[in-house]
UniProtKB/Swiss-Prot annotation:
It holds the Pfam family CAP_N-CM. Gene3D superfamilies: 2.160.20.70, Adenylate cyclase-associated CAP, N-terminal domain. Involved in the regulation of actin polymerization. It comes from Mus musculus (Mouse). This is Adenylyl cyclase-associated protein 2. The lineage of its organism: Eukaryota, Metazoa, Chordata, Craniata, Vertebrata. Keywords: Cell membrane, Membrane, Phosphoprotein.
Amino acid sequence: MTDMAGLMERLERAVIRLEQLSAGLDGPPRGCGEVNGVNGGVAPSVEAFDKLINSMVAEFLKNSRVLAGDVETHAEMVHGAFQAQRAFLLMVSQYQQPQENEVAVLLKPISEKIQEIQTFRERNRGSNMFNHLSAVSESIAALGWIAVSPKPGPYVKEMNDAATFYTNRVLKDYKHSDLRHVDWVRSYLNIWSELQAYIREHHTTGLTWSKTGPVASTASAFSILSSGPGLPPPPPPPPPPGPPPPFENEDKKEEPSPSRSALFAQLNQGEAITKGLRHVTDDKKTYKNPSLRAQGQIRSPTKTHTPSPTSPKSNSPQKHTPVLELEGKKWRVEYQEDRNDLVISETELKQVAYIFKCDKSTLQIKGKVNSITVDNCKKFGLVFDHVVGIVEVINSKDIQIQVMGRVPTISINKTEGCHLYLSEDALDCEIVSAKSSEMNVLVPQDDDYREFPIPEQFKTIWDGSKLVTEPAEIMA
């Protein structure tokens, strides 16, 4: 009886132990399993986005903390925007695409983060780091790629290009004095380059929603978007690679091909190789037959030239579709020809205008914008009210610009022919020119304009301690 009681006690302890082990094995790990048909596992696309945040965004955040101040605060906002996008991508990997109006509601957390970043720049225009803040503010709209189809990658590149306008200013100010700012620029631009690579791999033609989960809605996805789950720790480093596989062809000698053998056989003939040449009689020699000289050079019929189908001369110039549209905060005016009625009237202080390859056209920009760039245009006229940043003309020809209000700086680079009509309020603007010709400034005088040429030729002398450069005055 005693033995039976002891056996029962041991059996009971074994059952309790098995129950404990079973509970530990059967419980799903955190974030896994299915709830209401939604798989809680992390999709490869989300893991790749986590890698982007843990590497590029983390590097940018580290360099921003080194600079501290407004730059650090701004960078923390950028980090928050990427976390909001990570939460949205997690939802996309688990739910099917809803109606467009539902998508707009689901995108609201990201939109609010972007707006917060742009508002911070506007509220800190007096900051010593304003160019840093502007680089981020003008390009953070790249996070809106999730609403772009069918090619979100190029959209991110355009926003990256908008950032370089200001990062170039940062490099100009600090590249010889403080390399911390150079590291900051590099780490920030790397974010968008890496994001383009991520999009090419996981969302090439637009956002890829789940095909199996339930349809997303504000109710079903609110918990994901609002909770903003923390990022998982970075994965451990991969194990060291094994030894390389043996090279199978190490002991194999290359066997000579028949064509190569024949070639060496001919070369080994030495002087005997000329025995195979055919003798040319005098009647076929041009210098001994006057009739051949009279005919001039005759092409061999077997060597008629056929133009290559890929020859650039045979290709007609490609026609591009004219563009006049607002993308984010950037007005794109491209490939306009023979248009003198182009007008941009609904403008904001945050917006920039980029004008590219327009010919024989005129554009009027009303209101106040941040900056205007005229690139690769010919016989183009630009009329604008106010610009708070810079107007830049580059790689262009025969440009006319009329300022109705104010502009602090006008830059002219690699341009032939540029006429600037200034208003009374714009007479204090700075004009910076390089590698350009036929530049004239027209200032108002007695209800008319008086023209002044911008010097193109300069005289440089050594005054004993430094070089002194001044415009060369050539009298006719």
